[in-house]
Amino acid sequence: ELVPYIDANFKTIAKKDSRAMAGLSMGGMETRNITLARPEVFGYYGLLSGGTYSPEDIKDPSQVKGIFISCGSKEGPDRIMQAAEALKAAGFNAKGYVSPGTGHEFLTWRRSLREMAPMLFQK
């Protein structure tokens, strides 16, 4: 497994609350699948133009420290903001972000990373 290898070979804090997984586009969809299947491994989840989470998707909300979902304004942003609001209403630390004037492109994802980074690993 990759996570044990990283923890063994790099200076990490080998705890779930000190790990995040994020992906863009298809990598976001894979991030969604992995974080839902293995909530004990990652505390923070990020989907950048990679779909959404709903409160019903997450079996144990206490496992999740933060969720970030984003897309470009040309990608159908209503679903992103609705999902973020539903997660917040269910008690999750969640943030939705829409990159203005962009689509499914690297400018969207660079802006998304800038918005997501400050919410990671907060106490």
In which residue ranges do the predicted regions lie?
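Non-catalytic cap/lid and distal C-terminal segments of serine-dependent acyl enzymes
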Residues: 1-123
